[in-house]
Amino acid sequence: MSWQHELDELRRREAFADELGGPDKVKRQKEGGRYTVRERVVLMADEGTFHESGKIAGTAEYDENNELSKLIPSNFIFGKATVNGRPVIIGGDDFTVRGGSADATIREKHNMCEEMANALRLPLIRMVEGSGGGGSVKTIETTGRANVPGIGGWELLVQNIGTIPRVALGLGSVAGLGAAHLAASHYSVMIKEKSALFVAGPPVVARIGQHLSKNELGGYQIQLKSGAVDHAVDTEEEAFECVRRFLSYLPNSVYELPARGSQDDDSNRKVDWLINTIPRNTRKIYKVRPIIDAVVDEGSFFEMGHQYGRSVITGFARLDGWPVAFMASNPYSYGGCWTAATCKKVTKFVDLAETFHLPVVYLVDCPGFQIGLEAEQNGTIKEGVRTMSAMWQTTTPWCAIILRNCFGVAGAAHKNGGRYCTRYAWPSGRWGSLPLEGGIEAAYRAEIDAADDPRAKQEEIEERLNKLRSPFRSAETFWIEEIIDPRDTRSLLCDFANTSAPLRESGPRSFSMRP
């Protein structure tokens, strides 16, 4: 007895699923310059490796003989694949079927996608377009009632954030629950001019008197600066490549350790120009990204959050092949001071490093927290202590190198002060409770005001204190462990990475990361 008839029926149903929302909807998707969800999976996954679950799930129509006449697939597909040879779970919204909204979705598929990633301990790549299975006002008509809002399965996403790498791509207009899925990730990327992200789109926002286009409301420039997404690129192909690169630094789950990459770059390579990079004039600034690129393995720095919290640069890199989480103060933004946005960015980044067992490297040039009315209105100190708490909760190996400024409470947060952390300083390092500039006026106000020539008195005090704040005086009392030749920075960092590698421990941490 053969079961060929049933297999033929299966193939017929799969053919319906391959048609997505139908030729007209697919054509509209393509005319908008966007790939269909199945094309995206092909581009993301290694060739021929995607194994789909629930392909023929959807809304079926039967004729008078109870024979299937039509099948509209659910607007979410998912399955297992490999990316650069590594197993992953891929899930994607099908915008050609009701714009990805709830009245054409099967919630169990969304939940099982998260469950599969968690159970198999594999990274999840989430391609989001539309409402991501979220509600539509048409749902009231199809169900005959209004639902009390709820998000079944969100607990799975929360668990996954602390267990597996979760990557999200915004590949069109994303709203409501779709926006939440995009934001609830370790790394997110949008497509310039073709993606938009918002809680509610322009037609809804118009009801409160704001008449905006999709890009004006939630385009990539808005969301990069808000920190809602980490990256924006020109094409979907570039977005998929960003995902590949991001995942290359991370383990499959917290139960594994990040893998070592190639060791093609000499770990003892000296960078001669670093000796001249920090200006002696403290009012002059310098570019720190070339310093990062010079000390890490060539071409290995992968920056995230470029437009948000800009006074600290964050990204992944490799040192002698070992993946590390790399932070660096950026003097070009608020002089390197920590703003409220910077604190939020650093908190998430430190939690990410701790979750996935990445040693942290921090190039420090921090004059302190941002000051002034804007800083107070933004709650900078509140965000700052949250960041400090995140740092003090870390157990992952940590290395700080003080390039220039290290002042105040934010300066003190260059490492976890409650445990051993590797620390060096360049000879350009300067530190204290407050910078002399500004601090002198506060500490010596009475003496300056009483002088016949207050300006001359202030200059006299400043000259006297400048002689005392030499980094060598701090080294004499072991307040700084080691002052190094900047040209040796790479070799010392590679030594840190090699020393740290066997100290890393797999498994979940004492706290679970939040998006």
Please annotate each region the language model reported.
Residues 1-515:
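Ligand-binding clefts of soluble mixed alpha/beta catalytic domains
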